[in-house]
Amino acid sequence: MVGAEGEAIRQQAFTGRLPSDGFIDATLDDIHRRYRGLDDGEVADYIPILAEADPDWFGLSLIESAGTVHETGDADIAFSIQSISKAFVFALVCQARSTELVHERVGVNNTGLPFNSVMAIELNDGKPLNSMVNAGAIATTALMPGSTPAEKWENIRSGLSLFAGRQLSLDGRVYASEMEANQRNKALARLLESYERIITDPLDTVDIYTRQCSLSVTAHDLAVMGATLADGGINPVTRRRVVSAEIARDTLALLASCGMYENSGEWLFEIGLPAKSG
């Protein structure tokens, strides 16, 4: 459930009456103080190197569409973007190719299944259903323009950098660790190839997808990227348009319906905002 302070911000945002900078800063500080000692859950270990993350890291970053920054805690500590990259690659591919192509080749419906499931592919004639699950993200990455894998990768890296407002770089250790542990993604790509949902080399596509997930970001970067979508595709820091307002809207709609995987409905009911799990 949303706390009282968060609910106050949400209600003001929904009605167009934005809270003051001081109120936002005080609220973030209070949230950080209140929850920094929470130690439920475990550090992710499905990729070996992720298990090395410090569970005490906790940072909050909020950036307004005008570019005003509100931060507290470990907002400047770098980590790999992982599945959050899916939303922004979806937007970039829609901008470069067309939303209609992605809709036809991938889909926009929630699978109701775990993020790395093969069932959705098998049950829907090879259509992975949406770009937020692994199969759909791999199929979306395959649609990125580029005559070579290197060119496709650079288009993704540079595009995500435009969203972040700075040049993002690959975390080589994360990439190497993930490449050793992503047999399931390779299997998903092979299955998509068998249904002709991807026509590029499946292993090259998984390599590019793994690279995009291994880009190093901070909470600040993600706040800038999210604010770019919220402001209709315009980066609040650089003031540069990254994608059209229509594609920003479509991306937010997909995040609302599919961004939290099989729990997206519950998240939307309880929180009411687009989001993406990492």
Name every feature range the model reports, one short phrase each.
Residues 36-72:
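A short, well-structured edge-of-sheet supersecondary motif
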Residues 50-53, 128-130, 180, 271-276:
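Short Gly/Pro-enriched turn/cap motifs at secondary-structure boundaries
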